[in-house]
Amino acid sequence: MKYLKTIGKVLAAVAEPLRRNCAFAVFMYMLGCITAWATLPDARGAHLYDNLYLELFLDVYVLTLILTVLPRKVMIWVRGFFYFALYATAVVDVYCFVKFQSTLTPTMLQLVGETDSRESGEFLRSCVSPDVLLSNVGWVLLLMFVHIISALQLRFPHFIPRRWRELIKSIWLRTCELLRRARPVIGTAVLALLVWSVCASAHNKVATHKLMSGTTIGEVEHTLTEKDHAVLYQPIYRLVFSIYANTLTAMQIDRLVRTASKVQVDSCSFRSPNIVLIIGESYNRHHSSQYGYTMPTTPRQQKLEKQGRLVKYTDVVSPWNLTSFVFKLLFSMYSVGDKGEWCDYPLFPELFRKAGYHVTFITNQFLPKAKEAVYDFSGGFFLNNPKLSAAQFDTRNTQLHRYDEDLLKDYDELQGQNTDHNLIIFHLLGQHVQYRQRSPKERKLFRGDDYKEMKPNLNARERQTLADYDNAILYNDSVVTEIVKKFENEDAIVIYVPDHGEECYEGDMHFFCRMHSAKIDARLAHAEFDIPMWIWCSRKYIKKRPEVFRQVVNARNRRFMTDALAHMLLYLGGIHARDYKEQLNLLSPEYDENRPRILKKTTDYDKL
């Protein structure tokens, strides 16, 4: 009997937080469910978080436990704070999903910080507009309304009609009596649910802690590439993560801004009047017919190569297989193995501007937008920060496009701002997943059936994905060739290099995209780090600078990793600065070809 009493007390104690905070628990659980349902994308394959209901129960229970152990006077204020934070975050999160098709992101929070009072007022007015009230936001607002009415009924019963009061009182008394009689059963159920939810949610809680423990935004991003990364399934988690991500980027931005203020150029000979850098995306070198691939994916570039002014490089690798990591190393004068971090060094466009070049940046990826994923946020924050953007670029495009060819129209509009000495950077969407969306329908050449003999191990869907990828490369071939044509009659040099490679059913693999968490072996490096690279020179350029073109040709078979690209660019600009290193300049006779090419700071490419 004593044991039964002890068990009864334990069960009662377990259920006590929910009993004391019954209204809080019910409404907050309903809020969690409603926001999850309201932010479920209307897309094929979209589904709710698998552990939504159990983990939500655990989270709500923890909040009620906190309220239970607090003194009553303190508890009232803390509970009010919980209500405000959770309801407000839910409204904003669902509103963002309705308006921007994305829940809260670090970029959204960054954009909020840049709004003025007028824009804030417009946002608040839009929240109460009929179209918003009738959207999924309305469900959250309806729950708030019901919650407020129920709270008013308890505190100010005379506001409620007498018949309603009697009905509510009757229901309440019957419910309380039922709960009193069922207390042992309820205690057992709560304990069982609690144990179950802890076991089911432990992995995500550990993963969330790991995500929130990163020391840099790059580390956080890499954590998100892991297969079992944290699921931020509630608005409040997404808000906290967004604040955390912005805090991490702010630290690196501060260092970059300090470095930018100290940038110095010793001299500049303007060796190349027009330098054009084209940065591609997700380009597996072994899918380029220019490098021996079976399918004719690069006919235009091969034609340029046969004309003798396009020089392809045969042994180039990327230091990472993540765009944001590569971009930081491409733009910074830092190279793998240097002391400190990439953000402790100047960005090469800053040096070009300081030297007197007019710098243009035309991107089809890194413009700040509300629904920007953390990957783009991490890769573009140092390009889009107002101070750093002003330090790097004189001219930028202002909108993204569905297809890369529209960047040429952007350049046509901005070309009038060019000066005698120009650095022009094109950043393409290239072969970024989804491959099918990277080329217009009328420009597609390859079909899934074309790969039956080449890839008999693939099914029809996989062969079509492979065809989509090759069609994206073929379309990219036309885009980069059109960019080259823009400078045919100029005194110009054009460099093409993608950020990293890409898996697309290599060998016997049934996989596309990239394996961020896998150990790097020769096969993976072959697919995800081997990239194409070439340099094209106009006739005017070759005629005036035959020695530079000779250097370009002589370097074509050298081993190279693109973290050192900035040093070659400074050489082409004739820029002498403290951070320039001759041994990292691919075109220099002093270039150190034996420098280790370390992939992801872990693996020596040349020892695989």
Predicted regions and their residues:
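Short beta-strand segments
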Residues: 361-363, 423-430, 470, 493-498, ...
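Metal-dependent active-site segment of extracytoplasmic phospho-/sulfohydrolases and closely related
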Residues: 276, 472-514, 566-570
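Histidine-centered active-site microenvironments of extracellular/periplasmic hydrolases
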Residues: 292-296, 497-545, 582, 587, ...
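A short beta-strand-to-alpha-helix junction
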Residues: 340-346, 463-476, 518-531, 542-569, ...
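Polar, surface-exposed loop/tail segments
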Residues: 506, 549-562, 574-607
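Active-site-proximal alpha/beta segments of enzymes that process anionic O-linked groups
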Residues: 190-453, 528-530, 561-592
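A long, amphipathic alpha-helix that forms part
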Residues: 64, 409-412, 450-496, 520, ...
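Transmembrane and membrane-interface helices of multi-pass
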Residues: 1-223
